[in-house]
Amino acid sequence: MRAIGKLPKGVLILEFIGMMLLAVALLSVSDSLSLPEPFSRPEVQILMIFLGVLLMLPAAVVVILQVAKRLAPQLMNRPPQYSRSEREKDNDANH
């Protein structure tokens, strides 16, 4: 049985970078961490917060899609073309 939370390596890397960026922004905003001059401005700190959240969004999307596939596979997976019944064929004269 596959784990629902198993994420691709690229998504995990983005998630990690986003969390580190959020941690640095939080420490910088609370004055626990002193950053160099271009990064210590309030505008840059707000930008770091937004970038951190944006970098963590792909992981949330992947997890939501995995849960949706697990809960409702009929909605997420299209049936193959050959599985339609004889009544639903496109070349039927009765349509």
Curated annotation (Swiss-Prot):
The gene is ybjC. One of its GO terms (cellular component) is membrane. NCBIfam families: PRK10591.1-1 (NF007883). One of its GO terms (biological process) is response to paraquat. This is Uncharacterized protein YbjC.
